[in-house]
């Protein structure tokens, strides 16, 4: 049977398309990854998010035999980078370095370009770091009880330095739970905030251990308590807030997320590989150097944690009368 030229072309194209589809089908989740993986960090280089993303990314790349590229996309309280991942293909090749700010933004931002629950899956938890309550030389207190007593005796006397975002939330949470009236002064970063505390222009701060550690070493500020459930190995002599008489607990966590709909085999592969990385003594030492600890969770456990934290930080914002912008 003779075929027309047009019919022959159609059949040839159909055959090629079928072959391409078959080839694509063979490169499913079982072959993941078959190309480089991109991890978007929604903050500038140099912070804890960037530090941990680069370390884990480097280790993961070695284990998988594929390059893991770190792509910093700062801006708009992390929403630019976060939205990029929310709208990416759910194939495991675009990941998001996520932290506690992810669950705090919905409490203070009226309209997010993404849904924090519906638009994301969670392949891996990385770790957690504590906050530290620190004071400068201008505040005549030696422990947490004295700080709270001073705050109650002198309403609006104490100035809390904050870099906004996570630091603002944990500061507002401390102020509310301590039952004191204190002014929260906003700075353009943790460094200028702590510099002002050392200079006596602000009195105290509630910040991550990663942020305050260099300043504690200088001896110009002192730690009164930590916000973790147990004492920190890097500050063994500093009590927890609960030990010091205030049931205050706050921490920053880090995890990797992907666009919703990422196949379970890919999520599970990433979860398994990263869990093995987190178990390594050298990884735990790297986290400890930033005053943090590794934490391993399954994808479903991370999602439940995110849901619970959304409720928690929304309550903190409402109690502190933080306005949505």
Model-flagged regions — what are they?
Residues 102-111, 168, 172-177, 204-237:
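A ligand-binding cleft/hinge motif common to bilobed small-molecule-binding domains
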Residues 28, 34-36, 264-325:
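An extracytoplasmic/periplasmic, membrane-proximal ligand-sensing/linker region
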Residues 21-119, 156-157, 166-167, 179-204, ...:
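N-terminal (or domain-start) structured segment
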Residues 28, 128, 142, 212-280, ...:
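C-terminal lobe and pocket-closing loops
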Residues 87-92, 107-192, 243, 253-286:
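Hinge/capping helix and adjacent helix->loop/strand transition within the periplasmic-binding protein
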Residues 82, 145-148, 194, 213:
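Short hydrophobic/charged patches on amphipathic alpha-helices used for structural packing
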Residues 6-16:
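Bacterial N-terminal signal peptides
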């Amino acid at each position: 049977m003779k075929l027309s030229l047009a019919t022959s072309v159609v059949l040839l194209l159909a055959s090629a398309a079928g072959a391409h589809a078959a080839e694509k089908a063979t490169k499913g989740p079982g072959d993941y990854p078959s190309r480089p993986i991109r991890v978007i960090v929604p903050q500038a280089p140099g912070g804890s998010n960037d530090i941990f993303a680069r370390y884990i990314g480097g280790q993961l790349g070695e284990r998988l035999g594929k390059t893991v590229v770190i792509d910093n996309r700062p801006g708009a309280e992390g929403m630019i980078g976060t939205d990029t991942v929310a709208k990416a293909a759910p194939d495991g090749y675009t990941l998001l370095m996520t932290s506690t700010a992810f669950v705090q933004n919905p409490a203070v931002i009226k309209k997010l370009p993404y849904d924090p629950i519906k638009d994301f899956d969670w392949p891996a938890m990385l770790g957690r770091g504590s906050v530290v309550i620190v004071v400068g030389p201008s505040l005549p207190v030696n422990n947490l009880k004295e700080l709270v007593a001073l705050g109650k005796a002198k309403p609006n006397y104490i100035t809390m330095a904050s870099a906004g975002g996570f630091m603002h939330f944990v500061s507002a949470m401390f102020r509310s739970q301590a039952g004191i009236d204190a002014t929260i002064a906003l700075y353009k970063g943790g460094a200028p905030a702590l510099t002002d505390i050392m200079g006596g222009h602000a009195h105290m701060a509630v910040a991550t251990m990663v942020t305050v550690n260099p300043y504690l070493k200088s001896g110009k500020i002192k730690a009164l308590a930590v916000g973790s459930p147990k004492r920190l190995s890097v500050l063994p002599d500093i009590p927890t807030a609960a030990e010091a008489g205030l049931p205050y607990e706050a921490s920053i966590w880090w995890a990797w997320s992907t666009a919703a709909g990422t196949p379970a085999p890919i999520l599970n592969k990433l979860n398994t590989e990263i869990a093995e990385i987190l178990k390594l003594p050298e990884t735990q030492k790297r986290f400890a150097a930033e005053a943090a600890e590794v934490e391993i969770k399954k994808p479903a456990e991370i999602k439940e944690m995110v849901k619970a934290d959304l409720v928690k930080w929304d309550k903190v914002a409402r109690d502190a009368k933080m306005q949505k912008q």
